[in-house]
Amino acid sequence: MTIQATLLAGADVFGTVEIKAKKCLLTYGTSPCTASLNDAQACFKTRNVLNDCQDIPNYNETNVSYFFCDEKNTEVIDGFRPLLKNVSIAPSKLPARGGLANVSKVKFTFIDEPDTDTDLDDNILDRSYIARENGTFWGKFKARNSFIQGQEIVYSVTFYQSNGTLSKLNQRYQIESISWPNKNGEVTITAKDPLNLTDALNAKCPPVSRIKLYSALAVGTNHLFLDSVVGIKSPDNLTIFRIGDELMEVDGSTYAPQPDGSIKLNFTANGRGILGTVHAVHEVGATVQEVARFDALSIDAALAKIFNSYTDVTSLQLDTSGWSAQVSAWRSSSFLTNYISEPTDIKTLISQICDQNQVMMWYDPQTSKIKLKAVAPELGTLKSYTDANDIFDLQVAEDDTLRLNSVSMYLNPRSWIGGNKPSDFQDVAVSLDTLYYDLYGSPKERNLYSRWISSTPVALSTTGVLINRFRASPFRISFKMPYDNFPQTRLITGDNFRLETRQFQNATGSSYVPEFICVSTKYDKDMTLNVEAVSYSYFGGNNGPIGATSFDGQDYSTYIAANPNAGGILAWISQADGTMLNGDDSYYIT
């Protein structure tokens, strides 16, 4: 429903809420609905605990929206209930070192009031009570919508831009819970982004097994019998199982139901005791755990497989084309392999992939998409701001907790059912800070244990990025800025940008303009943008592609011309004759 500009007279900002719920399309007692009670006892066309649908097989679901505006609104807006009291948003925040963002959480507070039910109950005229004298809106809403968790709630802010243009900002979340009215008649709806809903990230990969051995399994046997295959979610034809401490591979194409109700599957050639485990005898009734397998997948493909196969997050919420573009540009050498035999929280696995490959993942409530971006320099034109013209309330601090002087990544596990100690891995990749290691007085180290990365050069890329970014204590900043009318300069989470301020000076006292990564954004009620960011200090080089078709269309000549003071951001590869594209002598790494 559109808010008309005439309703905004005297107000600069106007907030509304839309709750999207489910409802049956059918008319009570009319075919195909077979419910047969009288209309006074008709259902409320929703699935609920207390007054459920009376003909569940024919329940025909559709979406229905409920609209709310501010309780203090003096204009009557058709279809909007003036029950909204307050909206409190805790935005998603990216880890400073890259990885999976923390939860974004929104609390909507509503007042409650009696309600006539005229637009909610199709059978209101047949009821034996007067709706306005019986209960309240939220009490009845909650009783009629028992299964509202996961449904979408949209917070919309309509406002005038500084140029007088009417604009609207929508932020979409998913409902986690609705409280019962408290003693003051207030109801709280808690909503979160889809990355962090209980059913999404507390799901397990692989799922906890419900499968048992139907008969004992001897050493050397080339097939096994299962009591069922219920709950297996592997999309792979060649499925790996774990029984006890043995991993084994079966050929899904040999699936054969037996007369006794069991399921027979054949092992692949040499399919027993694989991946660092050994053959063993297994008793009847032993648990057969599906293994989630990832065979040399790109970062975006591995993440997509986790979301699509093991969570209820929909494919429409995944910005997979954006993921692919980032991975192709910056992490194309990373191919991930893992065999997960213990049910593990989805959030843990996504965090591992993001952290160990230096990519960031977060939910954008304005596009309703889960975004991914590599921790990398911005090769295009950086957004740039100053405290003289663009921002206010700037706070600056150095965060020594982020400093790193040594990063080690242990990789290639000796066994895929082993632990996460250094001795459980075959290889280690180490990057050291040789510039400032002992100058701070207390060198800081970090160890990563990766069951995803199998390439030492890729591991060294991650450890190198971390050292190059955090060998010096980075800046953490926060500031505010007005709403930007122009999308091309509007700051959003994940953006790289530069900030010029009197607070940043070099040793000569001249202006120093560092680069930052925006880790969090939130709009206030008055559309003031609150920003948190961490400095992007990069002392090493990312390899820049050869030729004019490099990332963002820039070659060596145009990049150097546009960024004369950006030395160290890119390490450009010379031509075959040893010169750079503009004729300069090539660089030497010493």
Please report, for each region that a protein language model flagged, where it lies by residue.
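Polar, enzyme-active/binding microenvironments
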Residues: 246-268, 353-355
